[in-house]
Swiss-Prot record:
One of its GO terms (molecular function) is RNA binding. One of its GO terms (biological process) is RNA splicing. InterPro entries: Domain_X, Maturase_MatK, Maturase_MatK_N. Usually encoded in the trnK tRNA gene intron. Probably assists in splicing its own and other chloroplast group II introns. Keywords: Chloroplast, mRNA processing, Plastid, RNA-binding, tRNA processing. The gene is matK. This is Maturase K. Belongs to the intron maturase 2 family. MatK subfamily. GO terms for cellular component: chloroplast.
Amino acid sequence: MEKSQIYLELDGFQQHNFLYPLLFREYIYALAQDHGLNRSTISLENGGYDNKSSSLSGKRLITLLYQQIHLSISANDSNPNQFIGHNNNLYSQMISEGFAVIVEIPFSLQLVSFLEGKEMAKSHNFQSIHSIFPFFEDNFSHLNYVLDVLIPHPIRPEILVQTFRYWVKDASSLHLLRFFLHEYFNWNSLITPKKSISSFSTSNPRFFLFLYNFHVYEYEFLFFFLRNQSSHLRLTSSGVLLERIHFYGKVDYLVEVFANGFQDILRLYKDLFMHYVRYQGKAILASKDTPLLMNKWKNYFVNLWQWHFHVWSQPGRVHINHLHKDSINFLGYLSSRRQNPLVVRSQMLENAFLIDNAMKKFETAVPIIPMIESLTKARFCNPLGNPISKPTWADSSDCHIIGRFVRICRNLSHYHSGSSKKKSLYRIKYILRVSCVKSLVRKHKSTVRVFLKRLGSEFFQXFLTEEEXVLSLIFSRASFTWRXLYXGRVXYXDIICINDLVNHDKLXXXXXXXXXXXXXXX
């Protein structure tokens, strides 16, 4: 028990970290203003945030903070609504972004202290997004079941604050965090509205990603810890315990007596391993276990969220899929494992033999229904998938309109070109091409036939050109703190996500800051 307690507290901060005074340092807001840290997530409007958050704005904000504290002390006013950022959107955003930089400092210091004296891995394996398919083929082809988990959002801000207390012991910072969550983002209801999450993540993307990943990290930390404790035969360090000795004796007895008749039962003890992958707001847990054990893992997830994090989660958020029958939605693909029969004719002298082999093939298909729903939302087609014009782009030049459609089509084509069945992809490209033509026809008040005759075949060649920039998936070989703790191989990768089609001219791929970990037995 003491060993488990030390294990769980190994990464926590036991000393007091006074982060609140850093809010009065000008360089904090300069770091928050650095777009090298927020380039992929912040959307700039009306001239951008650069012109507003100058060094002068930072100095004014610090002066107002000192004045606000002086007035609060002199008037003995504890009303939090009088905070300086409450009535000023600019200063509110600056404070929240600066606070996001501050709360990341303890975790950065922890990572630096861990890496001191250790040699950093210099080689990084840069692969395209299609490297995920051989990864699944090599690791998932022999598995049976997959848990498709939809990670719930923390719906009570106090849960986040209490979890954060294990890492940072600064009371002022905790009060400020509580204030941001309650006042600005309206997370003080039992059921979090979707609009609150949307405005939260849009106005303060860095702060949102930090809190979300911090919350998910906590539940994953407990998950990996309990998972390793359940893998009895793989924990050699726990063999000194008396109950574990009896456990090994029972297993040896089972191996000796029931070795021939109960191989499946023995596999529950000897082959208890799994693969865990997290991306965006979902997680996948794949294993070769029986349906009984997969149901136990499903109940574990639900109970962990409800009893430890006080987050209400319905069992329907965790689906058990059989890879032979069902498909899993992963990274924009519908992936499944099929048994393809293969008949081979073999002839030896005068005798001929027909050998029937069942080969396992990992198939990936484009989810056509969600793609059409996205195109419908972006006004490229109707709910039936029929292309329509894009009237909001009518004020742009012809070259600009064509360029927008071409960029979207190229990115979608590149991202989904790894599919084994491309019929759905061809339909999506057809919708975009026809929507582009109808948008130009509507702008020039012409007909489709006349317009295509004037443009010629060169118009469609632009949609068939290779994509200029290749989207990449980075697998890092650097070691992290918990890699030495867990009795398994853990790999990390940055999973890319596709931004909304409406709000961006270019269908860019942005780092979602959600780590995907694939854990297997060492």
